[in-house]
């Protein structure tokens, strides 16, 4: 067995040097998420965003990589750690959505160039995606009327920032 902590196995450096270890854990995470459907909380947030009057701009900032907020229909979504079901090539621009990893080989190759695929998720020791951080920065600069912090330990500064900002307003 690989005999390393999960935080190391799911890190950028290990993915680059020993992708089979990282993919082993990614497959386990995907299996745990497989078949999951949005719950009532996901549905309420998505519906609130769609039906609020006057029209509200409800933003969801999630650390989850399960894609459930998107599946529920949330319109304004910042998936700060990515989505496990979006795969991208490590060499070219090829991307695809894969909802079930069971058909993937242990080290899935790109259909375009044959290089290794990876999910569009933030591994440990990797930078957050620029598009997500820019979207969050834009919302932080606009401020908030109301912030709900649901289901998070708020261990990362970028997760607690909206709460702190709303408290200061």
Predicted regions and their residues:
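Conserved catalytic core of sirtuin-type NAD+-dependent deacylases
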Residues: 1-169
């Amino acid at each position: 067995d690989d005999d390393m902590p999960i935080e190391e196995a799911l890190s950028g450096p290990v993915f680059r040097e020993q992708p089979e270890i990282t993919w082993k854990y990614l497959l386990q995470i995907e299996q745990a998420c497989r078949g999951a459907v949005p719950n009532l909380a996901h549905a309420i947030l998505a519906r609130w965003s769609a039906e609020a009057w006057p029209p509200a701009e409800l933003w969801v900032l999630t650390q989850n990589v399960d894609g459930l907020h998107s599946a529920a229909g949330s319109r304004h979504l910042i998936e700060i750690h990515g989505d496990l079901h979006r795969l991208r090539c490590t060499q070219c621009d090829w991307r695809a959505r894969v909802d079930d990893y069971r058909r993937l080989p242990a080290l899935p190759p790109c259909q375009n160039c044959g290089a290794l695929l990876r999910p569009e998720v933030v591994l440990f020791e990797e930078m957050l995606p620029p598009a997500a951080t820019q979207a969050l920065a834009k919302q932080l600069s606009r401020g908030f009327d109301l912030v709900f912090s649901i289901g998070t330990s708020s261990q990362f500064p970028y997760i607690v920032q909206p709460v702190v900002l709303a408290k200061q307003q």
